[in-house]
């Protein structure tokens, strides 16, 4: 896929510990973000339940999927908005890691945790 740690842009979709909540206590997304950033990976967050100001106040780099691009998306939370999200307009998106196994097959390679990789053929 030609991704380099020094230039890849990763977006974590959802920071809550479970879907449709704003509770981030013990959220695996927080740990994952810290690991990625320690490795030098440019990491952003998109969570429709929080405002950009709230995300910045919590120390996150907000991402707006309507007008920004990224290389990798990691689904960290199963907010209902993510289940029907249209990823097709994100032209630079290389693949999605679906940590909650909520996405249907798409034209973008999707892999879920504990499942075989899948993509529309």
Where does each model-flagged region fall?
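Structural/interface elements that position substrates and couple domains in central-metabolism enzymes
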Residues: 1-121
